[in-house]
Amino acid sequence: MARYRCCRSQSRSRCYRQRRRGRRRRRRTCRRRRASRCCRRRYKLTCRRY
């Protein structure tokens, strides 16, 4: 299952897949179906899958 990161509306083409490398910065991770929900509602962000 690929996890997706939320990106800012300014750079909506820049959505990164969350890799399992040690990154301390945790942003809201979105799944396929919940991508539009978690990113759009609270943070007004767009989630895109590569």
From Swiss-Prot:
Keyword Kinase: no
Expression sites by tissue: Testis.
Chief subcellular location: nucleus
Keywords in alphabetical order: Chromosome, Developmental protein, Differentiation, Disulfide bond, DNA condensation, DNA-binding, Nucleosome core, Nucleus, Spermatogenesis
Keyword Disulfide bond: yes
Short name of one Pfam family: Protamine_P1
MF (Gene Ontology): DNA binding
One Gene Ontology biological process: chromosome condensation
InterPro entries: Protamine_P1
Protein localization: Nucleus; Chromosome
GO CC annotation terms, alphabetical: nucleosome; nucleus
Family: Belongs to the protamine P1 family.
Subunit structure: Cross-linked by interchain disulfide bonds around the DNA-helix.
Described function: Protamines substitute for histones in the chromatin of sperm during the haploid phase of spermatogenesis. They compact sperm DNA into a highly condensed, stable and inactive complex.
Record's protein name: Sperm protamine P1
Species this chain originates from: Saguinus imperator (Emperor tamarin)
